[in-house]
Amino acid sequence: MGQAASMCRFRGCRYKNKNKSSKQQQQQQQQQQQQQQQHQQQQQQTPSHSPQIQHHSEIIPATTGLHLRSIEEPATTPLQFQPTGRMNTEQGGTGYGGYGSSEHSLLIATRHAGVPLPLAQHQPLPAHYQPLNHSGAAPPSSSNGSSSSGGGVQTSATPQQQQQYQVQQPYQYQYQHHYHHQANSPQHHRPYDPEHARMEAWLDENQEFVQDYFIRKATRQTVDAWLVSHATSAGNDVVSSTSPTHANGQTSSSRGGSGATTPVRKISAHEFERGGLLKPIVNTIDGTPTFLSIGPPMDNGSVGGSCSNLQNVGGVVAGQYQYNHQQHHHNHAHLHHSQHSHYQAGGAVGSSSLGSTGGASGAGGAPSLGGSGGAGNGHQYPYYHCHQRPQRLSRNELKQLDEKELIFELVKDICNELEVRTLCHKILQNVSILLNADRGSLFLVQGRCNGPDGLKKCLVSKLFDVCPRSTVEEMEQQDEVRVAWGTGIAGHVAESGEPVNIPDAYQDERFNCEIDSLTGYRTKALLCMPIKDSSGDVIGVAQVINKMNGECFSEIDEKVFSSYLQFCGIGLRNAQLYEKSQLEIKRNQVLLDLARMIFEEQSTIEHMVFRILTHMQSLIQCQRVQILLVHEADKGSFSRVFDFEANDLSEEEATSRTSPYESRFPINIGITGHVATTGETVNVPNAYEDDRFDASVDENSCFKHRSILCMAIKNSLGQIIGVIQLINKFNELDFTKNDENFVEAFAIFCGMGIHNTHMYEKAIVAMAKQSVTLEVLSYHASATMDEAHRLRRLRVPSAVHFRLHDFKFDDIHFEDDDTLKACLRMFLDLDFVERFHIDYEVLCRWLLSVKKNYRNVTYHNWRHAFNVAQMMFAILTTTQWWKIFGEIECLALIIGCLCHDLDHRGTNNSFQIKASSPLAQLYSTSTMEHHHFDQCLMILNSPGNQILANLSSDDYCRVIRVLEDAILSTDLAVYFKKRGPFLESVSQPTSYWVAEEPRALLRAMSMTVCDLSAITKPWEIEKRVADLVSSEFFEQGDMEKQELNITPIDIMNREKEDELPMMQVNFIDSICLPIYEAFATLSDKLEPLVEGVRDNRGHWIDLADVVKTKTSQDQEPEEEQQQQNVISNGDCKAMSDDDVAASEAEVAVDSPSEKASVNGSNVANNSSNTNKKIAVASHPTSTQPSDDDNDVDADADDVDEQAAEENGHDAEVDEASCRSNSTCSSSTASSCLSTPPPTGEDDSTPVSPLKTLQAKLVAANLNALQRQTSNQAQTQKQRCKSCDHSRSGLQVRKTSSLRGAQELDLDSKTRNGTHAALCKSTPVINNHSHHHNHSHSHNHNHHHHHHHHSHHNHSQHGIGIGSASIGGSGLISLTTPLLAMDSDRIPKIVGKIGNLDGLPFANGIGGPQNGHGLPFGSYQHHHHHQHHHHLLARRHSETNSNGATAMAVEK
């Protein structure tokens, strides 16, 4: 009791102390026992599961319905107190009341979870104490009878109220719905427990607590049980559609898809849960899935009748119960209606009006006031409770009610009616009762003023001249009466919105007396009022005629009429909205069926169009439907025309015919051509009144065009692909706006269907072409029989002869036939031919076919595949791992090695993806590897190449599976995924690798080891293979630059060629070395592989150090600044402006200038450790040496590598221009050298300040050289103004750092003739004297060294020397930009000095040649001791036309 009291206090109920009396407790226990006994008797007598509840005479059902006082007073009236708020009985609650002391007066028959329980009360409550729910209305009761207490009118909860409660309280409704299912099973029948009922009632009231408790405490089993119990049973009957669906769902590509871009609707399925359990979307009728709903219809005469809402909830109409009520009326001051109800299983269904179960459902019951219900349609739907609507009171009974009670009773009569015609009939009958009128009419507003649909606003008589004795069926036989807007009395009321009360209708000019003449009825008094909705818009007009007593309608009648019509307006608007929603549901179901039908039939265009035509003719109901397809090439004509006529369905072949007729009838080109051209929709009510219609199509034919609806069919791009035309709607009606909307939707689906069918047909054609192409490809990809015969007759040497077991195997001396014979030896030694019964000639042809399908690329060719197979053979035989893998897997591995790069294009997977190649579209991951595998299968399945033909089915499947895994494992991306688990397992014993998963891992790693096996070979082999790989990579990089306009990665960038040694070291450390060390751990016999990798790594490190050393010795920009400071602070200060101008003039190439002879100059070698610096000094203006002792590094200028590579090309291009521009013939120069600047400037451009700086630098070097050579004689400065200059030199090919010493030596011998020894030692410079017409000469000395930079020594006045050559060969020259700063504006400068005639060599090797010079010694460059002998270092000089010497040094 304490718990019950606390719960009652929690819900606001008053708990009486007298409830604690023992007498009442005993009485309660007796009542419970009686109820249990009655329940047991009912179970024994009633075989069905439908519960029967008998009510005690003292039991009063829970109050429900609208109370009159609730209309007049707000819910917050002090005399009203709130109910418990628990779920009402008909909505799944316990029905247990908590008003006053009623708790001990319960007399409950049976405890069923969710079954309505009546409420017992000792004393009836007064009317103003009737409990109200939260909305101000009393909660619905479990019975449908009506009772009054103190004038209160009580009715049952209607299905509409239950549906509204379901929307407002979805959790409670689902709870009730769940227990309705459980209550009908025998295992859930249990006796009533009062304490359990109280707790359940409290939980019903406190849903927030229930949810919170469920979230915190519910177990997984509880949630699963809840989900199972709430699953929709109808969903199990749904048959999946046969229409194909796209695998990736969205974004479809523009290629091959419909192209439709449907936006994602911002709606969630959770939003539909607020309305309770909805009907299933998909149903099954005759084994065919459909979207049309099954079960009793909701929009026919039963709409608004009993069970109309609950029947369709959940899609499966459950069991119903019908209440039969006997009403007893008592003549008290306030009538009290008590009622006795009992359940009757399997009651009638489908009552359409209050008090009649017949109504619109056709059961025969007249919808009279107080009429009894008919038999209904007799359908029984188990599991659902459905309450029959209460019968309407008779007119005599209504007359006994006061005004407010009467209005309230009539409002209840219409508030739950949702069928428009039935509602209008009830409104007119109730209005006649209220106003005591003889008959009435009701008009509804249709159309809009200047609406987009073209319908004008008017009044349509839904019901006309309705009398109290008329029925809905009689009214349906009447024709509609249309009243123009603003015409007549009704039109005036609709337009003005004001009521009209006319005592004598014939006295009003707006009255139309023709109606009376037709009906024979005399209209006298007339009251007409508008019906408005909640927003104040006029939605209808109601009028009543002639009061029964012959009087006129008074102002009181007007007020009563107006008050009642306010409720009628709300009910009428709800009924219209409900009717529209039902029609919208039906339309959506039809469109969904159409979409399903279209997309499940896409085999041919004929089949798809035939289904569209049949569905459209059935829906629109017209005589003929045509679909005309526009010609793709000629948009002004139709390629195909499909006809369908209504009587085609009645022919004998209708069931077997799957395609429509084509071009049976004449085509109306006028209208269809207009639509096909403009895309406009044409709706013609009378074809002969339209100028576009060609009347000749009806000549000589019994068919006549009347109404035409024509619309364009468009694809997703908005292009017109066809026209759909409907002709002659049935019953001589015109095509309406709704028809246009339907045809528009059909046209959209038809366009998608036609597009998809065209794509399907194109796909079929493409597949046929592919089959033919594959057949042709397999024929040409296979080797000929003659080649196989020839290979078959060749003798195959042993594996020892081929050295196939050697890890240092080299195929450099192998011919192609030798590689094929070596492959045959592998198959023979591994016993594949005998074990798998491989035909030897088929094996020969297969090998020839595999070799034929490798492209002639630089590296990934047949030789690479052969070397990979040899390494796999060596590993299998050396380690005896063939015992682990078995013969089948060994066969797959050898085949995989030979085929793992089939049809390789010389590009990797990344390039295929970047280029969006067809291969990348075909395979998303491991693109090339999948292609290699497909090519392998194609060859294996080609006739004459089926080496696996004699394998069993299981062995063949296993070989293919291992083969695919092996080829895909050659992708480094797959290698990185599997390497981690493999490295963790290398310490396992041999027995560990026998299992399937470790064995597959070992196979994958073995493929990678063999694929990269070139890194384990001796250095000569590795070096050769590395050159091939880098060459192929560079080719791909060039393609990425040219075709894709992207910068390749470093390893494929030809500009980063000299960084390849270091990249190769990184490749070994990150990829190769870990896996080979792991394999050496697995088997000691694989240790040579690791040693080979480490040895090659050392060689690559040596090459990388060479590149690094050369790069580190390049002069930094700070040294350039130091040189500039030396020039500005030293000897250059003594230079006069005239000398500077002379220097600048001499710098300009091909321009005559004056030159002065040099008094004297010395050449010496200045060595410091490994860096050798060369300084050449000469004072520009005097013979006195300068005091500045600073030496300037000759290697002060950095040279761009790309410019160095372009140097030779520049010399060739400009050679002709140099020859044409030169005014003097060259003396001993072997070729003419021209070096245009990067900016395209020539040497005739004005002198720039930087050239002045360069001249100063040359003068400083010469001055420094002069101070160091004290033994040199002074010479006179001479100038020449009439000599021209020319350049000569040869190109030097830049070699890669990957080239070996042998190649470089061979290259040097080729270029230098027999004096190749000079390439490895200090070059000897031979002086040659050249005399000209002038007594003075022009001397040029230009030194240049190139590896990653250039070195230039320039002097205006220097030592005169003759033309020099190295080893008697031509001059070697390479010109690059001089300085990095301002390189885009500075031309390439060639230093010019005077002739060094008569200068002896410092080392005594050479002597004076013409009596004018001093000895000039050879020297070693400062890079000589740090570079390997096989790397090239180049110097070049340029001479003038008088015989200036150019010299180059190659190291």
UniProtKB/Swiss-Prot annotation:
Keyword Hydrolase tagged: yes
Molecular-function annotations in GO: 3',5'-cyclic-AMP phosphodiesterase activity; 3',5'-cyclic-GMP phosphodiesterase activity; metal ion binding
PDEase domain location: 783-1107
Alphabetical keyword list: cAMP, cGMP, Hydrolase, Metal-binding, Repeat
A GO BP annotation: cGMP metabolic process
Tissue specificity field: In adults, it is enriched in Malpighian tubules.
EC number: 3.1.4.35, 3.1.4.53
Catalytic activity as recorded in UniProt: 3',5'-cyclic GMP + H2O = GMP + H(+); 3',5'-cyclic AMP + H2O = AMP + H(+)
Cofactor annotation comment: Binds 2 divalent metal cations per subunit. Site 1 may preferentially bind zinc ions, while site 2 has a preference for magnesium and/or manganese ions.
Basic residues bias: start-end ranges: 11-21, 327-340, 1328-1355
Binding residues for a divalent metal cation 1: H864, H900, D901, D1011
Biased composition (Gly residues): 356-374
Cystine bridges: none
Residue ranges with Low complexity bias: 24-45, 135-147, 160-169, 341-355, 1142-1171, 1218-1234
GO cellular-component term (any): cytosol
Active site (catalytic residues): H860 (proton donor)
Span of domain GAF: 419-572, 604-754
Cofactor needs: a divalent metal cation
Family designation: Belongs to the cyclic nucleotide phosphodiesterase family.
Function recorded in the entry: Plays a role in signal transduction by regulating the intracellular concentration of cyclic nucleotides cAMP and cGMP. Dual-specificity phosphodiesterase that catalyzes the hydrolysis of both cAMP and cGMP to 5'-AMP and 5'-GMP, respectively.
Protein known as: Dual 3',5'-cyclic-AMP and -GMP phosphodiesterase 11
Organism: Drosophila melanogaster
